């Protein structure tokens, strides 16, 4: 199934957020009095003065602490052993650390707010106050754990240098911050294994919300959450009580810094683990798609209630505001280095939440300026980041720089299909209650859904290693992996549902590399095609599933993309995924392959898939899979592949037996003793059966060898015929499955006499009496005294079978290939011809009777007799009136073969002559038939009038001579040479009846009208014939050899060049899919809502001179009817589909009442030419003998 089209998300949080931001803005509340405003301003001024003094004292303490950090040599501890996932929690500082004095002083350092971004609709605002970063391990009983949100076992790419390297962070690469008041920040790396719960002591009244950050390898698609400072981009940690990764609030307790050795980060901030700043905030709000940027005068006091929101800033990723303000609050932080190689240090919260907001927006312009001065983006940056990580050796240690490499970003992944999800709100009404009156809206990540199990063993077996910018290692893959943008249409996936409110015990911190990135660059983009193809080889199933689904989406209707995927080798990778153990990967790989091999112009893709073992891989998946959707996709891919001539024989050799035994026989119900109603419903709606029969339909046109193998496949013919019988009994005449079965059987019925040994043994050369003629080549042998008749001993039963009684030569019920030519198959074919309104089914059924009735063997005669017995001749004649070129052509050829039987010839000449003549071009009504169809009608007329003077006279009385003369003389529209020769042949036959020449002369015709010299026909070859056909339409060689063989087009001198392949692919095989040549209407030959149009007309009196009258209009005026340009029937079918369950087919009304549907008059005497209503075929009550017309 193609991936759904990606659409934009409606941000549900915007209206509410905007309202909150406005409601908290200064002066926005109309009921605020001047007295209240003045009091608030004074209170804020006093607070600002107090904070200024505190910060100044703290600056001095920080400077002394910095000096101690530089001089002190730090040794590795247990916290600095290997860890694939590091988190730097915010540390609360209002609980005194042992041995550390914490005076509250003023700080004059201006903070820089960093906007962290994970996706286009989301942003995260962190307070920039910096403190020491520690990650500790403690007992689970006395601590809260940070939350791991949707941990994956397949959530990222591994760096070239593995992070399981047991390196210790012992390099104190400290460097003085260019601004005063900067402090040291410590990164402590614990030995906690990946996926292990991070345990921290909790402290009451201190909370930090961490919901989102830049996407890391561990991020789940449901919640793109921050991993803190996660050097290896490992998985997020899931908190207890927050099973679905809900944002959580954690109380934190200060850790004993002496228990851990730490390496000092180069960029020093205004806080230290030994001098905690009391004014640092303890809550960071994730504001979803709403990015809150507070700006104010950096030098002036901040009013108590003032929160100015900057919307549309380059740092603001969405145009919505949120309210994060409360009275009596301020914020102080350290400034950030204004240089391109900006060192990103995780931000820490201080002890006081009261100063979180007000100073947060004081220096918003300064952080904008910082990003303006950053270096240009690297060409291989994954999300357009601007920081140069290779140049950070002066700020970060080797391992830390390796850890924060930006290329650890991957596409959001999930197990399952391509889902798109809107704004997600957790059960606690989408807001986070902070201290005081502060609230913050948050929204979790909206890309992808689902959890996968994560194992640390998979981290060291990654396929693609990328540049380690810190270690300057060579990359095995130069192109960056960029995240694929997936969104869901509705938030209905069960794994998004929360079972409880958010946990309030986990601490979070932003990742180091996320702080260094320019938020303006955090825009999701569609991945490039080479990236998607490389993701097919990723070790994680969800990445592979997403990549395959995205390829399916890209290939839909785009042949250029299909060819590019083939050029880049994507077909091989998709075929490899067919043997994947994950069901979703199998589905998406099949869907992508189905689109890649759809269409006439994708033969190279089909051949490439065959060459890489795609057909055996599909069959393995079909045999082992029990999932209905997978089986449908597999058979759909095979259906599309079967339209390529170069692949057909490979499918027959490798897949024919498997398709028959695993799909055709079980789904048809042929081997079931009982056929209940439930199986009928399953049978009629089985898409797997539809796809498989469509594949067999294409394969049956691959030539003689293909037909032989399919006929000899056990159970195939029986099952196909059983499907037709079942559908006839359930009145399911127009389904695609029936159409495919009928067309397959038509191809398998071709050249039975010559290709099937059983047919030759069952009775060749025994048809003289049945054909009503003598065949000198068969019944006499030359001798010196002339030809001597053979003496044959025949029982009376073997002489003929007229459709009554047991069939000679068949004493048992037929099985297998014998059922193809058994006369019992005539009845279901005629039922479909009488009841179906699907032109493809009608053409296939008529073509089957055409093939079965051709030939010089007794079963062809039996078929002709069976058609007469089952009253099938009127059914065929009615279809001549149909407004469908290919159906008329097939029916005319079938009638021509039926006329080989003497009694059939009499009936056709008596009751069908007018229909045949009226389909000839000329007269007042324009002809919409192709040259091939007109030639087929002329051949039928020739056969009907041969050796039957009454029929020749009926043709003259019907006005046929005038139309035939117009064709041969080139009057009106020019006809092709084939049509001219066929018409000349009929006229020549009519002139042979000497008794009728007087009638011809009375009507104004002479010999010149009937005899066209061969030289004239040859000259016509060089004339300009605009409508000269180039189609290799030929009659069956068997048809050419029976009856009045002069009616065969081959004897008319109609020879057209054709290759050896054309000889093995006869004209009856119109069933190979040609993919892109199909249009919305399956049958372009008819532009009417219903392709069936049968007119009625009265028979003029015999005494009238019908030759001098204008012919009655054959068709009523219909402005919607268009001229057929080459009606294609089965060359376009089946449709190699791309959409699931999508087979654009024309729906036709049920045709049970022929008087209303086809406009037949309601009279009771059918002998009065064509003016009666034929009795219902399904009533099966036909009066008269087997030779009667009705």
Swiss-Prot record:
InterPro entries: ARM-like, ARM-type_fold, Armadillo, Plakophilin/d_Catenin. Disulfide bonds: none annotated. Keywords: Cell adhesion, Cell junction, Cell membrane, Coiled coil, Cytoplasm, Cytoskeleton, Membrane, Methylation, Phosphoprotein, Repeat. The modification Phosphothreonine is found at residues 84, 411, 1012, 1016. The gene is Pkp4. The modification Phosphoserine is found at residues 75, 106, 132, 136, 139, 220, 230, 235, 272, 280, 313, 326, 336, 391, 402, 405, 421, 426, 437, 509, 511, 514, 775, 1044, 1090, 1099, 1133. Plays a role as a regulator of Rho activity during cytokinesis. May play a role in junctional plaques. This is Plakophilin-4. The modification Phosphotyrosine is found at residues 371, 414, 477. The keyword Oxidoreductase does not apply. Residues 36-63 form a coiled coil. Its main location: other. Residues 772-781 have a biased composition (Basic and acidic residues). ARM repeats lie at residues 517-556, 559-598, 603-643, 861-900.
């Amino acid at each position: 199934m193609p991936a759904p089209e990606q659409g934009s998300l409606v941000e549900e949080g915007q209206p509410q957020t905007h309202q909150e931001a406005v409601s908290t803005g200064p002066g926005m509340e109309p009921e605020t009095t001047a007295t209240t405003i003045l009091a608030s301003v004074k209170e804020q001024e006093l607070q600002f003065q107090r904070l200024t003094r505190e910060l100044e004292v703290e600056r001095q303490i920080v400077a002394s602490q910095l000096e101690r950090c530089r001089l002190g040599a730090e040794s590795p501890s247990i916290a600095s052993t290997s860890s694939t996932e590091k988190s730097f929690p915010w540390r609360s500082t209002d609980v005194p650390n042992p041995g550390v004095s914490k005076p509250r002083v003023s700080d004059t350092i201006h903070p820089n707010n960093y906007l962290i971004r994970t996706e286009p609709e989301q942003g995260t605002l962190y307070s920039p106050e910096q403190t020491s970063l520690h990650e500790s391990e403690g007992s689970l009983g006395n601590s809260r754990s940070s939350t791991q949100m949707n941990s994956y076992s397949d959530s990222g790419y591994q760096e070239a240098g593995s992070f399981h390297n047991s390196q210790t962070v012992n390099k104190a690469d400290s460097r003085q911050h260019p601004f005063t008041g900067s402090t040291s920040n410590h990164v402590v790396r614990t030995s906690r294994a990946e996926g292990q719960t991070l345990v921290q002591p909790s402290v009451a009244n201190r909370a930090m919300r961490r919901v989102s950050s830049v996407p890391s390898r561990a991020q789940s698609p449901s919640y793109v959450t921050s991993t803190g400072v996660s050097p290896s981009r490992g998985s997020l940690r899931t908190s207890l009580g927050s099973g679905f990764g809900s944002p959580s609030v954690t109380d934190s307790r200060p850790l004993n810094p002496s228990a851990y050795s730490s390496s000092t980060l180069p960029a020093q901030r205004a806080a230290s683990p030994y001098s905690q700043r009391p004014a640092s905030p303890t809550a960071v709000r994730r504001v979803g798609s709403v990015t809150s940027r507070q700006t104010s005068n950096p030098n002036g006091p901040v009013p108590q209630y003032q929160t100015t929101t900057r919307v549309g800033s380059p740092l603001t990723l969405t145009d919505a505001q949120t309210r994060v303000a409360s009275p009596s609050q301020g914020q102080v932080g350290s400034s950030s280095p204004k240089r391109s190689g900006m060192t990103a240090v995780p931000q820490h919260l201080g002890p006081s939440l009261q100063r979180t907001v007000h100073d947060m927006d004081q220096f918003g312009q300064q952080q904008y300026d910082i990003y303006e001065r950053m270096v240009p983006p690297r060409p291989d940056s994954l999300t357009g980041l601007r920081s140069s990580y290779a140049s950070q050796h002066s700020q970060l240690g080797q391992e830390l720089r390796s850890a924060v490499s930006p290329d650890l970003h991957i596409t959001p992944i999930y197990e399952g299909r391509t889902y798109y999800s809107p704004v997600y709100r957790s059960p606690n009404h989408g807001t986070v209650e902070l201290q005081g009156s502060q609230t913050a809206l948050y929204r979790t990540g909206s890309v992808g859904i689902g959890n996968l199990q994560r194992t640390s063993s998979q981290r060291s077996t990654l396929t693609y290693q990328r540049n380690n910018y810190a270690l300057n290692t060579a990359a095995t893959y130069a192109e960056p992996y960029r995240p694929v943008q997936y969104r869901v249409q509705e938030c209905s996936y069960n794994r998004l549902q929360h079972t409880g409110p958010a946990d309030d015990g986990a601490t979070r911190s932003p990742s180091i590399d996320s702080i260094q990135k320019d938020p303006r660059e955090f825009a999701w983009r569609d991945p490039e095609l080479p990236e998607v193809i490389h993701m097919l080889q990723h070790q994680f199933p969800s990445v592979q599933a997403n990549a395959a689904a995205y390829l399916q989406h890209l290939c839909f209707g785009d042949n250029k993309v299909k060819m590019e995927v083939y050029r880049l080798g994507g077909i091989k990778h998709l075929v490899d995924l067919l043997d994947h153990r994950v069901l979703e990967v199998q589905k998406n790989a099949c869907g992508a392959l189905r689109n890649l091999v759809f269409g006439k112009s994708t033969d190279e893709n089909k051949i490439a898939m065959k060459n890489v073992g795609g057909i055996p891989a599909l069959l393995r998946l079909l045999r082992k899979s029990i999932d209905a959707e997978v089986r449908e996709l597999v058979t759909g891919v095979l259906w599309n592949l079967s339209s390529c001539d170069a692949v057909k024989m490979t499918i027959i050799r490798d897949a024919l037996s498997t398709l028959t035994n695993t799909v055709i026989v079980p789904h048809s119900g042929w081997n079931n003793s009982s056929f209940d109603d439930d199986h009928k419903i399953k049978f009629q709606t089985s898409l797997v059966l539809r796809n498989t029969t469509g594949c067999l339909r294409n394969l049956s046109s691959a030539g003689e060898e293909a037909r032989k193998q399919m006929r000899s496949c056990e159970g195939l013919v029986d099952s196909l015929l059983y499907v037709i019988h079942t559908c006839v009994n359930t009145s399911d005449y127009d389904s695609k499955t029936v159409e495919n079965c009928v067309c397959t059987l038509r191809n398998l019925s071709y050249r039975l006499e010559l290709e099937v040994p059983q047919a030759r043994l069952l009775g060749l050369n025994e048809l003289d009496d049945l054909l009503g003629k003598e065949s000198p080549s068969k019944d006499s042998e030359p001798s010196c005294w002339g030809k001597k008749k053979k003496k044959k001993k025949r029982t009376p039963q073997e002489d003929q079978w007229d459709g009554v009684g047991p069939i000679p030569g068949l004493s048992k019920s037929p099985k297998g290939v014998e059922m193809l030519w058994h006369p019992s198959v005539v009845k279901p074919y005629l039922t479909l011809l009488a009841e179906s309104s699907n032109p493809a089914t009608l053409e296939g059924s008529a073509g089957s009777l055409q093939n079965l009735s051709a030939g010089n063997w007794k079963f062809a005669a039996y078929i002709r007799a069976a058609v007469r017995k089952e009253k099938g001749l009127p059914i065929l004649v009615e279809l001549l009136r149909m407004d469908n070129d290919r159906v008329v052509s097939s029916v005319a050829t079938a009638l021509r073969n039926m006329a080989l039987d003497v009694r059939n010839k009499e009936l056709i000449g008596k009751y069908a002559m007018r229909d045949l003549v009226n389909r000839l071009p000329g007269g007042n009504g324009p002809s919409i038939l192709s040259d091939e169809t007109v030639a087929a009608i002329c051949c039928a007329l020739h056969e009907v009038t041969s050796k039957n003077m009454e029929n020749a006279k009926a043709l003259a009385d019907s006005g046929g001579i005038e139309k035939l003369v117009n064709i041969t003389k080139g009057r009106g529209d020019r006809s092709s040479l084939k049509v001219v020769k066929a018409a000349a042949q009929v006229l020549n036959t009519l002139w042979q009846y000497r008794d009728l020449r007087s009638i011809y002369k009375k009507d104004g015709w002479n010999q010149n009208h009937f005899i066209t010299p061969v030289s004239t026909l040859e000259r016509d070859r060089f004339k300009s014939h605009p409508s000269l056909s180039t189609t290799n339409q030929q009659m069956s060689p068997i048809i050419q050899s029976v009856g009045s063989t002069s009616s065969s087009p081959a004897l008319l001198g109609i020879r057209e060049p054709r290759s050896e392949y054309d000889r093995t692919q006869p004209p009856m095989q119109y069933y190979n899919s040609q993919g892109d040549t199909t249009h919305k209407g399956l049958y372009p030959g008819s532009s009417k809502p219903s392709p069936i149009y049968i007119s009625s007309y009265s028979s003029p009196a015999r005494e009238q001179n019908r030759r001098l009258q204008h012919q009655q209009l054959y068709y009523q005026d219909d402005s919607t009817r268009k001229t057929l340009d080459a009606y294609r029937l089965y060359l376009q079918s089946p449709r190699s589909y791309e959409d699931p369950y999508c087979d654009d087919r024309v729906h036709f009304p049920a045709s049970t009442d022929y008087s209303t549907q086809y406009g037949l008059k309601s009279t009771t005497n059918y002998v009065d030419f064509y003016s009666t209503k034929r009795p219902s075929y399904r009533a099966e009550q036909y009066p008269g003998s087997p030779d009667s017309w009705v």
